[in-house]
C-alpha cells in the first residue's frame, strides 16, 4: 500500500504547498529482482510523469531490507539503470540509509528507546558499515545524483566523516529529521555541531517525519498535533537558542526515552533560513 495517490491529490488541490516523493514499486523485487534497476527506473519515470517531485527510498532501513528479503545490494550491477536514470534526469532522491549506530549494540549501551522498541540488530540484519560502503560505491560511479540522506545520514556522532562526504560529493545533502539520537549527539559537543551547521548551511534541509506514524499505523488514525509540535520543539530547541534543558519522556514524541540534556547552539539567521526553507527551493 502507498500514500502517494493521496499525496498527489493534495498536490493537485494545493500545488504551491505540497511536493510529493514517490516510493518504489515493491512488487518488482519479486518479479524482476535480477533486473531491478531497469524496472524501478521505468516505475519512477511513470511516477514523475504523474507529478511526483522526487524519490524516497526507505529500503535502506535494515528492518525493511530484512522484511523484504529480496533486495539486492545497492551497489550491485542490477541497480545501474536506476542510478544512471537518476543522474541523467537530476530527479532528487531522499534516502533513509541505515539506522542509529546504537541499534547494532552492545545492548547494555543502547538507549532505552532502542532497547524497548525492539530495535537492536543482530547478524541477520544488514550491517550499517556495509551499507555505507555500498553507498560510497554508488557515489563514486554516479557523483552527480541529487541524494538527500535522511537523519543526518546517521552520522551525528561522526561529523568529520560526514563533512568529508559533503566535501567530496557536491550534490549530496542531508536532512535533520529526528531520530532522537541526532539531538543527543549534537548536544554533546555544541561547538563542533554549530561549526558544522554554519559551514554546511547550504547542504542541510529541514525534516520532521510528521505523519509517519499515521501512514504506518495498522488502523487509520488522524495526525497527532501534540506529537507534531513536540517534534518541531525538539528541532527548534537545538538550533534557535542557546538552550539548556532536560528533556524527559513526554508521551508525545519522546516515548520510552532516557532523560537527556539538550544544549542548543543558536544558529545564525542566515543558516536557519537556508535550513528551514531556502535549501528546498
Regions found by a protein language model. Name each.
Residues 3-11, 32-44, 104-110, 128-140, ...:
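Distinct, well-ordered alpha-helical segments
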Residues 14, 88-89, 142-143, 168-169, ...:
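Helix C-cap/helix->beta junction micro-motif
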Residues 120, 141-148:
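Short, surface-exposed connector motifs at secondary-structure boundaries
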Residues 130-137, 146-281:
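H/E-rich (His + Asp/Glu) clusters that bind or coordinate divalent metals
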